[in-house]
A protein has these predicted regions:
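Short acidic N-proximal helix/loop "leader" segments that mark the beginning
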Residues: 1-19
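Helix N-cap motif at beta-to-alpha junctions
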Residues: 32-33, 72
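Solvent-exposed alpha-helix faces
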Residues: 41-44, 84
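A short N-terminal helical cap/helix-turn-helix that marks the beginning
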Residues: 47, 51-57, 85-96
Length: 96
């Protein structure tokens, strides 16, 4: 569990992520629905492997992501690690 100062400090290293209602949040845009859905599938596969599941919201070519650790009822380091993974996948594959 991270305190408020640790959360704010960790947010500085993430591009575009914000704290919204005590949840890490970011919106991603894509050229097509298929790209958006492929992005969600990559995240879902990785999330299963690490047993840490984000909330994914899809509307055509937009994916909104909310990260929160339910077991600790707070934001934890796991959320920031998953946010980094998500950002890396987006930059490597979908940011064109």
């Amino acid at each position: 569990m991270l305190d408020e100062n640790e959360i704010k400090e960790n947010l500085k290293s993430l591009d575009g992520w914000v704290l919204r209602n005590s949840i890490l949040y970011k919106k991603f845009s894509f050229k097509t629905f298929m790209n958006a859905f492929s992005f969600m599938n990559i995240i879902a596969d990785h999330s299963e492997k690490i047993d840490h599941h984000p909330k994914l919201i899809n509307g055509y070519n937009v994916v909104e992501i909310e990260l929160y650790t339910h077991s600790s009822n707070s934001i934890t380091k796991k959320d920031f690690l998953l946010a980094e993974f998500i950002d890396n996948i987006y930059e490597e594959i979908f940011s064109q």
